[in-house]
C-alpha cells in the first residue's frame, strides 16, 4: 500500500448561480496576458451545450483520455508511445483557435476620438491576436449562456446519448444547468502519459498536476491527451499552460482563487488519502459503469487506525491526516455519496467532483409535476432535468449513483422543512434513503450554512521534509511562460525571445562601483 494525499474539490451544482465570478477572477490572476487571451483555466458552461472548446466531450473526435485494450491494459486513446511520437510534428486532433474562439476587445478609444457626426460612435470589436477589426463575433467561452443559440447546435451535446433529445427542444420540456469546469488534477492523468518531453508531473504532497515550463517544448500532445481540454498553448512563449490549482495558496493553507471568490459558496476543498497502488487496477476496470465505484475504492478511510499508522510511516505529516479527517470532500464523496466525478469513463480518475443539481427538480415537485412513489419522496426518475443526462455526465451512464444523491438531498430538505415549518421531526424520508439524523443534520450544515473553515480544510505544506532540499531551494515557482529564466538552455524551437533573470548581485556591485 502506497499512501498519498490529494487536495480535491467538490462543486455543489445545486447552488451555482452562473455568475462567472470564478472565471473572471481566475482570468485576472493567471491568464490576463499576451499569448493566453483565449485561455480560461476556469469557465462556466450552460448545459445542455457543446461547451468550450467546441464538443470537448467528443473523444472520438479529440482522442482524449484512456482506452482499455483487449488484454486488460489501458493506454492513451491518442495512441501508444510510438503512436504519440508519430504525431509530434503533425497532430491532427489538436483544437484550433476557432474551436475555442478568437479573443477580442472593443475599440473604446474610438468613442473618445471619433469626429463629430450625425450618428453616435460605436466600439467595434478588435482581435486580441492580430489587433485587426473584426466584422462579427461568432463564438466565445460562454456563447451558449442561458441556452443561447438554437437547440439544433446544443443538441450535439454528447450527454444526450441514449436519450430522445428531440423532445427537449420543445419549450415546455427544456431544461438547463450550470457546469463550472477546471483542470481535474486526475489520479491517472492522460496528459502526463502523452507528453513526449516528460514536462507534466503530479506532485506527491498534494496531487496537483503541473507543467515544467523549462522542459515543455510545445508539442501540444498534452492538449489532445487531456479529455477535459484544460491545457492551453501559449502562442507567445511556445509553451503549454494549465490550471495550477493555485498551488502557492494551497501550500500556505489558503483556498484557490476560484473557491475564495465564489459568490454562491458552492466550492469545497479538502484532503483525501488514497492508495497509489490501486490506481492502475481501478482505471483498468472492464465496464465503464463500474469506474465510479472502483475509484471510490482507491480512497482510504482517514479514521482507520491502521491507515493512520501506515501513513505516518510513509511520511504523511500529522496535520495532513488531521485535515483528511475533517475534509468536506471526503464527507460528500465517500460518507454521504453526494458528489460524483465528471466523466469517469475517461479513466483518468478525476479529483474535481460535482453534487448534481436538485433545485429545479424540487420546485417542479412542489408544483405537483412529479408522480408520487410508494414512499414519502416523489418519483424522481421522471424529472425536469433528465436523470439519464446527469448520469451520462457524472457516472458513465449509470443512473444509480445520481438517483441516490438526488434522493438523499431531497430527503434532507423534507426532514429540515418538517422541523422548521411544521415543528415536528419527520424521519420517514431519511429512513427511506438510508441516512441517520446525525448525518442529515451534518449534511445540512455543510450544504447550506457552512462556515469558511468548514468548506476549506487545507493543510499547510512541509518544505522542511523535502527529500532533496537543494532541489527545492533551486526550484522555481509559477512563471508566465518563460520557464525558470536562469537555466542554461538557449535553444528555442519557436524562436521567441527569452527573458533571462536579472542577476541582482551584479546590478548591486555595478551600482556600488559607480
From Swiss-Prot:
Record: residues binding [4Fe-4S] cluster 2: 26, 243, 246, 258
Annotated GO MF terms: 3 iron, 4 sulfur cluster binding; 4 iron, 4 sulfur cluster binding; electron transfer activity; iron-sulfur cluster binding; metal ion binding; nitrate reductase (quinone) activity; nitrate reductase activity
GO cellular component: membrane; nitrate reductase complex; plasma membrane
Claim: Electron transport is one of the keywords in the record: yes
Topology in the lipid bilayer: Peripheral membrane protein
Cofactor(s), by name: [4Fe-4S] cluster; [3Fe-4S] cluster
InterPro entries: 4Fe4S_Fe-S-bd, Nitr_red_bet_C, Nitr_red_bet_C_sf, NO3_Rdtase_bsu
EC number: 1.7.5.1
Annotated cofactor note: Binds 3 [4Fe-4S] clusters per subunit.
Main location, first listed in the record: membrane
Subcellular location: Cell membrane
Binding site for [3Fe-4S] cluster: 195, 216, 222
Top EC group: oxidoreductase
Binding site for [4Fe-4S] cluster 3: 183, 186, 191, 226
Known catalytic reactions: nitrate + a quinol = a quinone + nitrite + H2O
Listed GO biological process terms: anaerobic electron transport chain; anaerobic respiration; DNA damage response; nitrate assimilation; nitrate metabolic process
Residue positions binding [4Fe-4S] cluster 1: 16, 19, 22, 262
Keywords: 3Fe-4S, 4Fe-4S, Cell membrane, Electron transport, Iron, Iron-sulfur, Membrane, Metal-binding, Nitrate assimilation, Oxidoreductase, Repeat, Transport
Every 4Fe-4S ferredoxin-type domain range: 7-35, 174-205, 207-236
Function field: This is a second nitrate reductase enzyme which can substitute for the NRA enzyme and allows E.coli to use nitrate as an electron acceptor during anaerobic growth. The beta chain is an electron transfer unit containing four cysteine clusters involved in the formation of iron-sulfur centers. Electrons are transferred from the gamma chain to the molybdenum cofactor of the alpha subunit.
Subunit organization: Dimer of heterotrimers each composed of an alpha, a beta and a gamma chain. Alpha and beta are catalytic chains; gamma chains are involved in binding the enzyme complex to the cytoplasmic membrane.
Identification of the protein by name: Respiratory nitrate reductase 2 beta chain
Species whose genome carries this gene: Escherichia coli (strain K12)
Amino acid at each position: 500500500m502506497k499512501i498519498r494525499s490529494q487536495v480535491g474539490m467538490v462543486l455543489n451544482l445545486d447552488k451555482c448561480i452562473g455568475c462567472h465570478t470564478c472565471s473572471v477572477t481566475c482570468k485576472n490572476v493567471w491568464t490576463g496576458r499576451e499569448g493566453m487571451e483565449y485561455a480560461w483555466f476556469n469557465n462556466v458552461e450552460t448545459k445542455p451545450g457543446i461547451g468550450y472548446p467546441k464538443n470537448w466531450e467528443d473523444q472520438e473526435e479529440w482522442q482524449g483520455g484512456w482506452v482499455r485494450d483487449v488484454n486488460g491494459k489501458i493506454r492513451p486513446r491518442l495512441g501508444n508511445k510510438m503512436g504519440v511520437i508519430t504525431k509530434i510534428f503533425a497532430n491532427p486532433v489538436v483544437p484550433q483557435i476557432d474551436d475555442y474562439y478568437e479573443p477580442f476587445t472593443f475599440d473604446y478609444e474610438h468613442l473618445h476620438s471619433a469626429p463629430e457626426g450625425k450618428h453616435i460612435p460605436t466600439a467595434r470589436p478588435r482581435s486580441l491576436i492580430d489587433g485587426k477589426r473584426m466584422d462579427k463575433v461568432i463564438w466565445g467561452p460562454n456563447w451558449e449562456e442561458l441556452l443561447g443559440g438554437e437547440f439544433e447546435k446544443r443538441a450535439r451535446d454528447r450527454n444526450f446519448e441514449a436519450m430522445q433529445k428531440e423532445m427537449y427542444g420543445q419549450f415546455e420540456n427544456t431544461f438547463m444547468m450550470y457546469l463550472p469546469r477546471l483542470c481535474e488534477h486526475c489520479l491517472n492523468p492522460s496528459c502526463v502519459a502523452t507528453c513526449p518531453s516528460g514536462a507534466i508531473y503530479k506532485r506527491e504532497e498534494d496531487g496537483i498536476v503541473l507543467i515544467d515550463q523549462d522542459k515543455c517544448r510545445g508539442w501540444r500532445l498534452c492538449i489532445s491527451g487531456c479529455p477535459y481540454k484544460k491545457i492551453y498553448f501559449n502562442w507567445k512563449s511556445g509553451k503549454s499552460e494549465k490550471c495550477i490549482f493555485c498551488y502557492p495558496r494551497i501550500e500556505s493553507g489558503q483556498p484557490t482563487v476560484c473557491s475564495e471568490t465564489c459568490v454562491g459558496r458552492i466550492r469545497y476543498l479538502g484532503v483525501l488519502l488514497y492508495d497509489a497502488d490501486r490506481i492502475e487496477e481501478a482505471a483498468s476496470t472492464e465496464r465503464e459503469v463500474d469506474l465510479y465505484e472502483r475509484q471510490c475504492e482507491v480512497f482510504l478511510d482517514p479514521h482507520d487506525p491502521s491507515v493512520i499508522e501506515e501513513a505516518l510511516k510513509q511520511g504523511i505529516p500529522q496535520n495532513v491526516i488531521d485535515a483528511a479527517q475533517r475534509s468536506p470532500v471526503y464527507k460528500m464523496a465517500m460518507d454521504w455519496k453526494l458528489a460524483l466525478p465528471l466523466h469517469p469513463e475517461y479513466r483518468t480518475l478525476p479529483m474535481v467532483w460535482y453534487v448534481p443539481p436538485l433545485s429545479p427538480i424540487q420546485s417542479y415537485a412542489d408544483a405537483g409535476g412529479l408522480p408520487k412513489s410508494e414512499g414519502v419522496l416523489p418519483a424522481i426518475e421522471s424529472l425536469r432535468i433528465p436523470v439519464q443526462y446527469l448520469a451520462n455526465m457524472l457516472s458513465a451512464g449509470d443512473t444509480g449513483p445520481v438517483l441516490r444523491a438526488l434522493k438523499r438531498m431531497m430527503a434532507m430538505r423534507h426532514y429540515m422543512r418538517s422541523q422548521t415549518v411544521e415543528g415536528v421531526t419527520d424521519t420517514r424520508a431519511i429512513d427511506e434513503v438510508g441516512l441517520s439524523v446525525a448525518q442529515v443534520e451534518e449534511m445540512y450544515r455543510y450544504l447550506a450554512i457552512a462556515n469558511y473553515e468548514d468548506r476549506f480544510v487545507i493543510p499547510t505544506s512541509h518544505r522542511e521534509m523535502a527529500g532533496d532540499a537543494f532541489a527545492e531551494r533551486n526550484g522555481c515557482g509559477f512563471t508566465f511562460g518563460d520557464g525558470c529564466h536562469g537555466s542554461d538552455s538557449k535553444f528555442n524551437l519557436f524562436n521567441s525571445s527569452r527573458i533571462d533573470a536579472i542577476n541582482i548581485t551584479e546590478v548591486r556591485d555595478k551600482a556600488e562601483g559607480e
